[in-house]
């Protein structure tokens, strides 16, 4: 057996291609690698004297085959998977594929596909195949060069190029090489997959679900494939294109890096994309152009990924600008520059956006009102933005607020109370939801969420003043006027909020009262506004440091009564919130919610810089300070600074000598709960050892 292996190894270079050394370093199934693999797989225990020598020999043979010093982990896995793939192939295909010495799994798959596409034809040598194919396809210009590079660099996919973007940089006297290629037949179907009767393959077009990307790029790929002179060439071109597209899909699910996000923002700032996206955020052509711009810079992203990232950046920027997030967004300056440049530009007509007609319009960062950009409320965040997790978790315990909201009816508007939910975790939780409705007080009215959803579902250019949800869009001028009059709720001349039409005083119902908002109270320190003076008083305690609520047990002060109630449970030992899965109890509902995420695996807080995810907001805030370099917590005694509040609290106890965590066995005190947990393992070991001693007796 070993003699056969040695005979195979004796002349490994006689049939070796001289250009093989210039290819990738993997050389997965080259003759040398195949001989090493066979020596490893065919090694017998009887060839050595003992188990130690057998194990050492196997180790040596495995290193000769996989070469861990020169190969990465991915390359070693590639070799193992390639070996198993070749083993499970049918014998008639396996023999021929092994003779071709595929260098990686992708090349092996391509060889098997070639055999299956032409089962009755003789498969030629790869270089000969290439020469014949290039000779037949010589008139195809750019397509020929694409095929040559795809054939020779199957392992390393080339960066995609887009003729549409390149043609814009050509001089007027030049003509793109792509236009010299023969045109596809004019009767080529555009809505269905065209079945190639000679090869049994399906040529995918724009309307079908194929391996290539859809819409314009799918049509381009289909036409280039149709230009191939024969069925074999079309099959080869299709295989190369599919392998190229498979690398694009590798970027799916990969977090956005810092440089990649900066490149996306640079593309937005150097074009009219950002302004167009404010009028139509679901325009697929714009996101496709953004993806092409990223591809030209070496970043592989799909249009849908560009759309999701753009809306995530918008959401983060909007939160920071409105004071909802204490730490600044890392790309705040870039987004602020984009928003300012678009706001100063003249308003664009709806028909200036390519492909807007017939597309779904979403409510975005800005909205047109009488030709001027005005900020929209947080309630208009669409479904895609709602998928981007808020910095606060909406699933935590909420309190109910009675907020007067304007509801539409057939005669106009009326005020009703709507239950509002807000997070208890933030100290200004009660004023956040009210502040969202009042911080843009120039609007003059509250909008009900159901009314907003109905407005968002209509295109901006077609939004009409409606009398009822079921009313038709097409109306006579008199009907439209009456419908518009019923929508205006003031008893004096006003400008309509939705469409900008002026309404005289006579069109309003005399019995309708004028809409008035409660006076807004503003904090002189930070400028935040509140609908009630009591909310302002409570907020000012943050600046003054006042803590009127004192614990009768330890004297600790709190600015909120709810925080004092939660603190008292540490003295009484009350833990009313219990986990339904493991039975663990907590004294705060927010702690239970964070704990439950350990069972569900939910991590709603994701860093936009590195993509790392967290299951609670405190860890997320501390992590973001790593990127910004911020350390807001400073010890007044020694001057040491911290970026994490929990570490800062533990450090302060070293100065005060406070040890709130005590062992129930020996009454020893600790400054950290983790230190107490480690200490309790000592007692547990002692208990277990004593039980084992009694069992032995």
From Swiss-Prot:
Its main location: nucleus. It is found in: Nucleus. The keyword Cytoplasm does not apply. One of its GO terms (molecular function) is DNA-binding transcription factor activity, RNA polymerase II-specific. Residues 1-33, 144-177, 347-395, 451-482 are annotated as: Disordered. There is a cross-link at residues 152, 163, 400, 685 (Glycyl lysine isopeptide (Lys-Gly) (interchain with G-Cter in SUMO2)). It comes from the Eukaryota. A zinc finger (C2H2-type) spans 521-543, 549-571, 577-599, 605-627, 633-655, 661-683. One of its GO terms (biological process) is regulation of transcription by RNA polymerase II. Residues 37-119 form the SCAN box domain. The keyword Mitochondrion does not apply. Residues 10-33 have a biased composition (Polar residues). Residues 212-296 form the KRAB domain. Keywords: DNA-binding, Isopeptide bond, Metal-binding, Nucleus, Repeat, Transcription, Transcription regulation, Ubl conjugation, Zinc, Zinc-finger. Residues 383-395, 451-461, 472-482 have a biased composition (Basic and acidic residues). GO terms for cellular component: nucleus. May be involved in transcriptional regulation. PANTHER family: ZINC FINGER PROTEIN, ZINC FINGER PROTEIN 2-LIKE ISOFORM X1. Belongs to the krueppel C2H2-type zinc-finger protein family. This is Zinc finger and SCAN domain-containing protein 32. The gene is ZSCAN32.
């Amino acid at each position: 057996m070993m003699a056969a292996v040695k005979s195979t190894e004796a002349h490994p270079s006689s049939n070796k291609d001289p250009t093989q050394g210039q290819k990738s370093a993997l050389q997965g199934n080259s003759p040398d690698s195949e001989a090493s693999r066979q020596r490893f797989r065919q090694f017998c225990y009887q060839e050595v004297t003992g188990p130690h020598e057998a194990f050492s020999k196997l180790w040596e043979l495995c290193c000769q085959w996989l070469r861990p010093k020169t190969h990465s982990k991915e390359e070693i896995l590639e070799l193992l998977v390639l070996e198993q793939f070749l083993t499970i192939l049918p014998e008639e295909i396996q023999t021929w594929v092994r003779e071709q010495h595929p260098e990686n799994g992708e090349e092996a798959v391509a060889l098997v596909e070639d055999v299956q596409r032409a089962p009755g034809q003789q498969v030629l040598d790869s270089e000969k195949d290439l020469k014949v194919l290039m000779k037949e396809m010589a008139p195809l210009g750019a397509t020929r060069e694409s095929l040559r590079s795809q054939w020779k660099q199957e392992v390393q996919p080339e960066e995609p190029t887009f003729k549409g973007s390149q043609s814009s940089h050509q001089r007027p006297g030049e003509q793109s090489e792509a236009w010299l290629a023969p045109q596809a037949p004019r009767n080529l179907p555009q809505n269905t997959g065209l079945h190639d009767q000679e090869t049994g393959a399906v040529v995918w077009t724009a309307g079908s679900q194929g391996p290539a990307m859809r819409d314009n790029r799918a049509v381009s790929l289909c036409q280039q494939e149709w230009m191939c002179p024969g069925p074999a060439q079309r099959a080869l071109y299709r295989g190369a294109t599919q392998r190229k597209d498979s690398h694009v899909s590798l970027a799916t699910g990969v977090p956005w890096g810092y440089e990649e996000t900066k490149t996306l923002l640079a593309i937005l700032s150097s074009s009219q994309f950002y302004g167009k996206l404010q009028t139509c955020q679901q325009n697929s052509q714009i996101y496709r152009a953004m993806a092409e711009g990223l591809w030209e810079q070496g970043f592989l992203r799909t249009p849908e990924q560009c759309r999701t990232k753009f809306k995530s950046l918008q959401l983060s920027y909007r939160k920071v600008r409105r004071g909802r997030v204490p730490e600044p967004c890392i790309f705040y300056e870039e987004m602020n520059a984009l928003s300012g440049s678009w706001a100063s530009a003249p308003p664009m007509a709806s028909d200036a956006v390519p492909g807007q007609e017939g597309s779904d319009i979403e409510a975005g960062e800005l909205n047109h009102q009488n030709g001027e950009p005005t900020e929209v409320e947080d309630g208009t965040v669409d479904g895609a933005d709602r998928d981007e997790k808020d910095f606060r978790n909406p699933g935590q315990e909420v309190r109910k607020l009675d907020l007067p909201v304007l509801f539409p009816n057939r005669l106009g508007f009326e005020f009703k109370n709507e239950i509002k939910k807000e997070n208890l975790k933030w100290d200004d939780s009660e004023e956040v939801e009210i502040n969202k409705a009042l911080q843009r007080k120039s609007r003059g009215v509250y909008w009900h969420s159901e009314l907003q959803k109905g407005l968002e579902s209509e295109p901006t250019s077609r939004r009409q003043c409606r009398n009822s949800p079921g009313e038709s869009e097409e109306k006579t001028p008199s009907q439209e006027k009456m419908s518009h009059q019923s929508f205006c709720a003031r008893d004096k001349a006003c400008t309509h909020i939705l469409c900008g039409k002026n309404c005289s005083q006579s069109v309003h119902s005399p019995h309708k009262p004028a809409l008035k908002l409660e006076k807004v109270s503003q904090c002189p320190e930070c400028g935040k506004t509140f609908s009630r003076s009591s909310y302002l008083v409570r907020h000012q305690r943050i600046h003054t440091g006042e803590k009127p609520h004192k614990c009768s047990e330890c004297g600790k002060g709190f600015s909120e009564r709810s925080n004092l109630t939660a603190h008292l449970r540490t003295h009484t030992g009350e833990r009313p919130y219990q986990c339904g899965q493991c039975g663990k109890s907590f004294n705060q509902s927010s702690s239970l919610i964070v704990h439950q995420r350990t069972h569900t695996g939910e991590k709603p807080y994701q860093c936009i810089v590195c993509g790392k995810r967290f299951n609670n907001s405190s860890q997320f805030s501390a992590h973001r300070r790593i990127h910004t370099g911020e350390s807001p917590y400073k010890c007044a005694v020694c001057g040491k600074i911290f970026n994490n509040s929990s570490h800062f609290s533990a450090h302060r106890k070293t100065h005060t000598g406070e040890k709130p965590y005590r062992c129930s066995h020996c009454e020893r005190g600790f400054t950290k709960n983790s230190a107490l947990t480690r200490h309790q393992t000592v007692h547990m070991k002692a208990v277990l050892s004593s039980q084992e001693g009694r069992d032995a007796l």
